[in-house]
């Protein structure tokens, strides 16, 4: 399955592959 995106981020990058950080939402989500 896909990795879970749940890291807290603040306009930065996510350590989990396939995840992105939206500047308006401080949690990594699937891109």
From Swiss-Prot:
Among PROSITE patterns, the record links this protein to:
CYCLOTIDE, CYCLOTIDE_MOEBIUS
Regarding how it is modified after translation, the entry says: This is a cyclic peptide.
Disulfide-bond pairs as recorded: 5-19, 9-21, 14-28
Q: Name one Pfam family in it.
A: Cyclotide
| Sorted UniProt keywords | Disulfide bond, Knottin, Plant defense
Protein origin, superkingdom: Eukaryota
Tissues of expression: Expressed in leaves but not in petals, petioles, roots and runners (at protein level).
The location annotated for the cross-link Cyclopeptide (Gly-Asn) is 1-31
GO BP field: defense response
Give the comment on domains: The presence of a 'disulfide through disulfide knot' structurally defines this protein as a knottin.
Protein family membership: Belongs to the cyclotide family. Moebius subfamily.
Protein task? Probably participates in a plant defense mechanism.
**Designated name of the protein:** Cycloviolacin-O23
């Amino acid at each position: 399955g896909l990795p879970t995106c749940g890291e807290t981020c603040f306009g930065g990058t996510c350590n989990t592959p396939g995840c992105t950080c939206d500047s308006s939402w401080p949690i990594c989500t699937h891109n």
